[in-house]
Amino acid sequence: MAQNKNLNLELSLSQYVEDDPWVLKKKLSDSDLYYSAQLYLPKQEMEHFVLPEMDHDLVRKLGAGVEVKVRDVDSVDDFYTVRLKVRNGQYYLGKGWGLIKNAKVLNTGDHIGLFWDKLTREVKFKHFKSQSITMHREAGTTSTQKNVLQKK
């Protein structure tokens, strides 16, 4: 019988480190909710944590915009089809974002979290309401993100 030395079969529900999958965190501003039908996403976090997890073909089409499914983790049956696009180096959710902000009754100052689930090929969404989410001052990164960024 062969010996098993240091075999680690630990499974994770997320491809992200630690227990904080919310790699895109944002405190909503008036411009996210009232002045445009777009939610601009943090560029550094998109490029370090989201794009590497997406299919290459999907990333290649971001300039023209791609439809992605956004699923609310607090209500698994709630999902929305939203256009994810990049323009002038800025990533944003466009068409469909208005449905989410209205359905979830999002307000200025509310915090939201997002991440790309590569298994289901969809964006996971969480509304933290007006709760503060732990963020570092440098580039608005979470502790999980900061550790990964420092390793690069």
From Swiss-Prot:
Localization (cell): Nucleus
Superkingdom of origin: Eukaryota
Keywords: DNA-binding, Nucleus, Transcription, Transcription regulation
A GO molecular function held by the record: DNA binding
Positions of the DNA-binding region: 24-131
A single Gene Ontology CC term: nucleus
Keyword Transcription found: yes
InterPro entries in the record: B3_DNA-bd, B3_domain, DNA-bd_pseudobarrel_sf
SMART domains for the chain: B3
Main location: nucleus
Entry protein name: B3 domain-containing protein At1g10455
Organism: Arabidopsis thaliana
